Amino acid sequence: TIYVLTRSESRFENNVNFINWDPDSQRLDLSNIPAVDFIINLAGASIDGSRWTNSYKRKILESRLNSTSLLFKEIKKLKQKPSLYIGASATGFYKKNTKVAQVEKDYKGSDFLSDVVAKWEKESNNFMKYGIRTVLLRIGLVLSKDGGVLKKLYPIFKLFLGVPIGSG
């Protein structure tokens, strides 16, 4: 059985159970779920969606910490813990250096995103306290004409006003 946590109304659709939750108010009830085998947590405010005011920076950080801490709090209550937690993280962890490829053991940067990622990963690592294998995916921005940052740039490219994104 697949369960998807959503801010929308709870419902059952196409063999998927949608469960309402609100990480900001720490509201989630998993008591009716018999077991959770694994969790995939991709929750967090978009980093490409708004001007980075102080209040939006707070939203970027809190949306990640609140969702992760709420999942941890609810998982602690389950008799049978999941065997795997997969959490989104970000390549924004690393120092800004375009001359050398970054590797996992490289040191954290000193900017806002680096701090967000470090706090987010620390929160995610709480799952290990219960013997839950924890995998954190340090991913970059989503590049698809259907979503993410590229969706916003796609109209510019269609008008032949775009420039190469980078070498990869």
Predicted regions and their residues:
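NAD(P)H-binding glycine-rich loop region in Rossmannoid oxidoreductase-like domains
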Residues: 17-70
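N-terminal Rossmann NAD(P)H-binding glycine-rich loop of SDR-like oxidoreductase domains
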Residues: 1
